[in-house]
Amino acid sequence: MPELPEVEVTRRGIEPYVAGRRVERVDVRTPALRWPIPPGFARLLHGRLVRKVERRGKYLLFEIDEGWFIVHLGMTGTLRVLRNVPHPPAAAKHDHVDWIFDDFILRFRDPRRFGAVLWHPRSAGDVLDHPLLADLGVEPFAPSFSGALLHRKTRGRKVSVKQALLAGEIVVGVGNIYASESLFRAGIRPTTPAGRISLVRYDLLADAVRVTLAAAIEKGGSTLRDFVGSNGESGYFQLDYFVYDRAGQPCRVCGTPIKQIVQGQRSTYYCPTCQR
């Protein structure tokens, strides 16, 4: 599943193309995604100017005068910029939505159809008040994200620290891959109850989350199965993993074999020596 780095890589790749440009047409081939694309969506966007593209958690927010259309990549979704000159590229089976501009197409592809294309009218208030966005945690690169925040929000909680990161109620966008990698950098075992971790160790974890996500964005995200950036290129951060998907391989720091366990039906990877 695309996590925060992959969504941010997509946003950075798309915005220079679409910001300040008008949508000439929208082709909706598959309205039945995770949630149905609203009727009249294509007509609503016809001729509209895209002001900017922002990100909240794993959601992409495209602003036009009348509101915002929201895109979530789901498990296998991608957004690609494709040149339509001299001929528009043919759509394949899993290409569900095209936003057509004068000299390129923004194409949403999603083989498993767990992604979403939604509409939030300006009359309904700010886009951050949308039901899917209103209760999200703090952004990991925001000044308000800190070890003190993690420490305060987890007091009395028995859930594991990894599950607390994944929940998205405290901090957004830290999915399975980057939770495992961040906990390794901080030297914290993922099974540790969140409420038992000290402020000092949470300071280390907050720094580790930021460093890990920034490094992943710099490498274009991770490509394990489906993800490609807006230009169709794969990410390369998976080559730098310390623990994720490395079960049985030696730790890059101490040489101890990486251990794999299951938490909440998801695989967790850690070093039994480096992480306490």
UniProtKB/Swiss-Prot annotation:
<keyword id="KW-0378">Hydrolase</keyword>
<dbReference type="InterPro" id="IPR000214">
    <property type="entry name" value="Znf_DNA_glyclase/AP_lyase"/>
</dbReference>
<keyword id="KW-0238">DNA-binding</keyword>
<feature type="binding site">
    <location>
        <position position="112"/>
    </location>
    <ligand>
        <name>DNA</name>
    </ligand>
</feature>
<feature type="active site" description="Proton donor; for delta-elimination activity">
    <location>
        <position position="266"/>
    </location>
</feature>
<comment type="function">
    <text>Involved in base excision repair of DNA damaged by oxidation or by mutagenic agents. Acts as a DNA glycosylase that recognizes and removes damaged bases. Has a preference for oxidized purines, such as 7,8-dihydro-8-oxoguanine (8-oxoG). Has AP (apurinic/apyrimidinic) lyase activity and introduces nicks in the DNA strand. Cleaves the DNA backbone by beta-delta elimination to generate a single-strand break at the site of the removed base with both 3'- and 5'-phosphates.</text>
</comment>
<dbReference type="InterPro" id="IPR035937">
    <property type="entry name" value="MutM-like_N-ter"/>
</dbReference>
<dbReference type="Pfam" id="PF06827">
    <property type="entry name" value="zf-FPG_IleRS"/>
</dbReference>
<keyword id="KW-0479">Metal-binding</keyword>
<keyword id="KW-0234">DNA repair</keyword>
<keyword id="KW-0326">Glycosidase</keyword>
<dbReference type="GO" id="GO:0008270">
    <property type="term" value="F:zinc ion binding"/>
</dbReference>
<keyword id="KW-0511">Multifunctional enzyme</keyword>
<dbReference type="GO" id="GO:0006284">
    <property type="term" value="P:base-excision repair"/>
</dbReference>
<comment type="similarity">
    <text>Belongs to the FPG family.</text>
</comment>
<dbReference type="GO" id="GO:0034039">
    <property type="term" value="F:8-oxo-7,8-dihydroguanine DNA N-glycosylase activity"/>
</dbReference>
<dbReference type="InterPro" id="IPR012319">
    <property type="entry name" value="FPG_cat"/>
</dbReference>
<feature type="active site" description="Proton donor">
    <location>
        <position position="3"/>
    </location>
</feature>
<comment type="subunit">
    <text>Monomer.</text>
</comment>
<feature type="binding site">
    <location>
        <position position="94"/>
    </location>
    <ligand>
        <name>DNA</name>
    </ligand>
</feature>
<protein>
    <recommendedName>
        <fullName>Formamidopyrimidine-DNA glycosylase</fullName>
        <ecNumber>3.2.2.23</ecNumber>
        <ecNumber>4.2.99.18</ecNumber>
    </recommendedName>
</protein>
<feature type="active site" description="Schiff-base intermediate with DNA">
    <location>
        <position position="2"/>
    </location>
</feature>
<dbReference type="InterPro" id="IPR020629">
    <property type="entry name" value="Formamido-pyr_DNA_Glyclase"/>
</dbReference>
<dbReference type="GO" id="GO:0140078">
    <property type="term" value="F:class I DNA-(apurinic or apyrimidinic site) endonuclease activity"/>
</dbReference>
<feature type="active site" description="Proton donor; for beta-elimination activity">
    <location>
        <position position="58"/>
    </location>
</feature>
<keyword id="KW-0456">Lyase</keyword>
<feature type="binding site">
    <location>
        <position position="157"/>
    </location>
    <ligand>
        <name>DNA</name>
    </ligand>
</feature>
<dbReference type="InterPro" id="IPR010663">
    <property type="entry name" value="Znf_FPG/IleRS"/>
</dbReference>
<dbReference type="InterPro" id="IPR015886">
    <property type="entry name" value="DNA_glyclase/AP_lyase_DNA-bd"/>
</dbReference>
<dbReference type="InterPro" id="IPR015887">
    <property type="entry name" value="DNA_glyclase_Znf_dom_DNA_BS"/>
</dbReference>
<dbReference type="InterPro" id="IPR010979">
    <property type="entry name" value="Ribosomal_uS13-like_H2TH"/>
</dbReference>
<keyword id="KW-0863">Zinc-finger</keyword>
<keyword id="KW-0862">Zinc</keyword>
<dbReference type="Pfam" id="PF06831">
    <property type="entry name" value="H2TH"/>
</dbReference>
<feature type="zinc finger region" description="FPG-type">
    <location>
        <begin position="242"/>
        <end position="276"/>
    </location>
</feature>
<keyword id="KW-0227">DNA damage</keyword>
<dbReference type="Pfam" id="PF01149">
    <property type="entry name" value="Fapy_DNA_glyco"/>
</dbReference>
<dbReference type="GO" id="GO:0003684">
    <property type="term" value="F:damaged DNA binding"/>
</dbReference>
